[in-house]
Amino acid sequence: FRSGMKIETIHAFCERLLRLFPVEAGISPGFTIMSEQMARAELERALRFVARRHRSGAVARALAAVARATDEETCLDLLARIHGARTALALFLGGDGASKLPPILHPLLRLPEGLTATRVRQGLAFDVDAYSGLAETLRRGPKTDRERAGHIDRQAHGGATLIELSTLFLTTEGKPRTANGLISKSLARDEPWALELLLADQERLIRGLAALADLDHVGATVELMSLAAAVVKEVADRKQRANLLDFEDLIIHVNRLLSARPEAAWVLYKL
């Protein structure tokens, strides 16, 4: 006690208030508060039900995309975080849901509005004639240069992009090659234009791959939120049938009880 008042957590206060005024809050008396373990288990059951129910369509595509991007445990962790923040997310996204995310995320990632993976790949096209000339030049160099020329010969065709030539510019770990890793010193000295071309296109490739990765993240986020919408709805239906409330529900119902519902004035008077 402090100054005669009992100090309670916000959730304990909300639970006590809802047990005093369940009908006024629009909930059934005798509700059960879910522990974190119960909430996690309910979320997992809801996810499995959604997966069984949606064998095709948008939700199925979202589930497949999320499954490709992460494992089941991480997926459940992400869904739990989204479910816990569902009220704030609903206020933020409004009725648009996941479709509202790309215009929000693109500026945060410094992606131009409306940018697509197709446009990025188109921007990574290269001049086939220029690279044919580069291959001829590389064939005059040592063994490593001749191997680079062979790689260009195999990939330099109509429709190819710098992505197909990525091993010229990047190591197996995906790191940029140094100038000496792009072309031999002797050939770079004799043919400086060749090194300039390789360095310029290396930078162009790095920027393009970064943009594609960011677009993948945006797409994965949209798919995750689409899946989460179906899972959150299923969890809500299950909780309603079993008369269960989680911690977020306590705050939601008390907020409505004290502000939005017609009985608010009477409840405040009784308090």
Which role fits each region the language model picked out?
Residues 75-245:
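Conserved ATP-driven helicase/translocase motor core recognized via long
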Residues 17-33, 43-46, 62-63, 75-78, ...:
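Generic alpha-helix signal with a bias toward terminal, lower-confidence helices
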Residues 14, 21-25, 47-58, 70, ...:
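Conserved NTP-handling cores and scaffolds of large molecular machines
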Residues 12, 45-75, 87, 126-133, ...:
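Accessory nucleic-acid engagement/destabilization modules that flank
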Residues 1-64, 100-104, 113:
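Conserved P-loop NTPase-based nucleic-acid remodeling module centered on helicase motor cores
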